[in-house]
């Protein structure tokens, strides 16, 4: 009771049978006695080697689809990381405020907030490898950079990509997460799923 748990769902996973059925879970929730699951649909348009259905739908079609399941979707579309953080924070603040306004109600009709986050597939990775588009294509799924003993030519590209995350700022010389990073973790009462 009183909990809010965010659940991030990829658009490819969201169209599988069990997850597609779970969009109806809100019909069983009672905010007088239950917590709240905030679905976050991460829409990047591709699964293993195919486009996704949600990735081919317009924002209006998505809004109609989810409204039909009893959800009130909020949308964040991001291609710039800094703007994405700002827009996500602003939107999540609105959603949490709305959820808190629904608490204590036994029934809610077409008001269950959810979030649709749209980003390019493979965002922050290499844009192109061996003259093939990676970012924004199915090639970004699973293993975007192929490296073999016989063909190690992409190793410098992989190293550059991984170093772009600045692991030296996160880990000490022994490979452990630095104390100042560990100290950023929320206290148990502030962990996701333990909100009141």
Question: What does each of the following model-derived ranges do?
Answer:
Residues 1-30:
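Cofactor-binding active-site loop characterized by glycine-rich and histidine/acidic residues
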């Amino acid at each position: 009771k009183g909990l809010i748990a965010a659940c991030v769902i990829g658009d490819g996973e969201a169209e599988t049978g069990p997850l597609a059925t779970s969009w109806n879970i809100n019909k069983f929730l009672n905010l007088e006695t239950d917590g709240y699951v905030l679905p976050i649909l991460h829409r990047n348009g591709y699964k293993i080697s195919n486009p996704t259905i949600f990735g081919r739908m317009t924002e209006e079609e998505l809004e109609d689809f989810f409204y039909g399941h009893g959800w009130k979707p909020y949308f964040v579309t991001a291609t710039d990381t800094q703007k994405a953080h700002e827009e996500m924070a602003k939107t999540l603040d609105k959603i949490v405020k709305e959820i808190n306004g629904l608490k204590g109600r036994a029934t809610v009709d077409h008001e269950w907030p959810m979030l649709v986050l749209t980003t390019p597939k493979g965002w922050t990775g290499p844009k192109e490898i061996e003259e093939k588009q990676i970012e924004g294509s199915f090639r970004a799924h699973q293993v975007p950079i192929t490296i073999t003993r016989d063909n190690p030519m992409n190793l410098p590209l992989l190293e550059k990509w991984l170093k772009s995350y600045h692991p030296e700022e996160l880990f000490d010389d022994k490979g452990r997460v630095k104390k100042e990073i560990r100290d950023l973790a929320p206290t148990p009462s502030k962990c996701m799923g333990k909100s009141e």
